[in-house]
Design a protein with these regions (language model features):
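Interdomain helical linkers/hinges and coiled-coil/dimerization scaffolds
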Residues: 1-101, 122-128, 133-147, 151-184, ...
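Short catalytic/binding micro-motifs of nucleotide second-messenger systems
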Residues: 67-69, 105-113
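Charged/polar positions within long, soluble alpha-helices
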Residues: 111, 115, 223-231
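Short, well-ordered alpha-helical segments
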Residues: 168, 226-239
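AAA+ ATPase "lid" subdomain C-terminal helix
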Residues: 201-205, 224
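Short, intrinsically disordered, charge-balanced linker/junction segments flanking boundaries
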Residues: 241-248
């Protein structure tokens, strides 16, 4: 299920689908997604280290969270660990405390983490299975708040459109970039980026997820405008760097 949430944007869910396709023991109550991200110093995290950390994190989560849930499943997606909880509405605050406790237990395990840092993003709690996808989106948005809030925290975001949307900074970047690329003026390109950066950081109430989203959009536009042969590989490398960005 969590793998499908990561890779299938058209995924539709219902209580019946959760039971019949994914074999979950769902009950009326609340659904909530959590997302945890590993950030290794120098982005040199090795696959066996990633798995070792995630297996320990899963062990802690399964031991503590399942006591208060109808069902709880986890899935590892590279440097991300996702979990989906289905629990009685009355357990909402208790679940929140347990998730925080589990996260803190893992943060204390320096023997596992070494130089790796963790961040945990909480999705919104939803009543209907069809809204689990929205909780998944919010969990990932919450993780992006580490750009402003820092690592080693349990983070939360809301479902608002944010404050950058009305500033149309991506449109401004596109216009300014066009003239800069026509003249191949490196300094003008650098200035274009700096102007957008400064306007972004000076915007009151800006969220980390908005910044990350804008960086992705501007970066993709820049790559598409470049006259280079392997744009797909360049885009993949850029996306990976965005995933591993921990500060602005």
């Amino acid at each position: 299920l969590l793998h499908d949430l990561c890779h299938d944007r058209s995924l539709g869910l219902s209580e019946d689908i959760l039971r019949e396709k994914y074999y979950l023991n769902v009950q009326p109550g609340l659904y909530q997604v959590l997302a945890i991200k590993q950030d290794a110093e120098g982005n040199d995290s090795k696959e066996d280290t990633i798995e070792l950390i995630w297996h320990k994190m899963e062990e802690i989560l399964q031991r503590e969270i399942t006591k208060e849930c109808y069902d709880f499943v986890t899935a590892i997606e590279g440097e991300y660990l996702y979990g989906l909880m289905n629990y009685p509405a009355r357990n909402s605050e208790k679940i929140r405390k347990i998730v925080r406790s589990c996260f803190n237990q893992m943060l204390a395990r320096n023997d596992y983490l070494g130089k790796t840092q963790l961040s945990l993003g909480l999705g919104s709690s939803v009543k209907e299975a069809e809204n689990i996808k929205g909780s998944f989106v919010i969990a990932n948005r919450s993780l992006a708040e580490r750009l402003l809030e820092g690592n080693s925290k349990m983070l939360e975001a809301d479902a608002s459109n944010g404050v950058l949307y009305e500033k149309k900074l991506v449109d401004k970047f596109t216009r300014n970039l066009g003239s800069a690329l026509q003249t191949l003026d490196v300094e003008e390109i650098r200035n274009t980026i700096n102007v957008i950066y400064n306007e972004t950081m000076e915007t009151p109430g800006v969220h980390g997820w908005e910044i990350l989203e804008m960086i992705r959009q501007c970066g993709s536009i820049f790559i598409m405008r470049l006259d280079v042969p392997d744009k797909a590989e360049l885009q993949k490398e850029f996306d990976n760097k965005c995933d591993n960005c921990v500060t602005v």
